[in-house]
């Protein structure tokens, strides 16, 4: 789609560097049953989560990282809503969904992705997080969830300034699914009309199941 894959990879290495300022506040660094957000209000939790963007930009500036890397840090969440804590605020305080004041408190500062590379990073970050919650062998659910993550961000206007077309978003989705299925050791999932005769939604068999049995009288690991 005309994007720079090396730049995408470099941005991916640094996009969450701001989380190192307060690592225990982010779920990927928390031990089971130990979540400091349990004792905080939704608005304070959202402010802490949102701050990893500002903290990352400050680190990038201090260490003189190139501007494209800084762009990846700034734009990788766009202006997306911090959904979990937004939902808690609605539940606890009875706010009306879509309230402008609440929206400002529970959205990332942006800007929205301005390039193909930051748009890919934005989507990959969301898809990777969602894929962690889906068990191996749930290929149909994986395809549905990846598609929904991309569509939710498109519908929210997060990709409006990146110039990506619907066709390119479809190609990005297919690429994500191939990568995720490779990591999870599953076959690539194809939608109806896209499948080929070798595709399957079932996990690959173990290698030893695909090998012929050893000849009689021969040790399976050699002579």
Language-model features, listed with the residues they occupy:
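Long, low-complexity, intrinsically disordered segments
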Residues: 203-223
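Generic low-complexity, intrinsically disordered sequence content enriched
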Residues: 146, 184, 211-215
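Divalent metal-dependent catalytic cores for phosphoryl transfer on phosphate-bearing substrates
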Residues: 1-156, 165
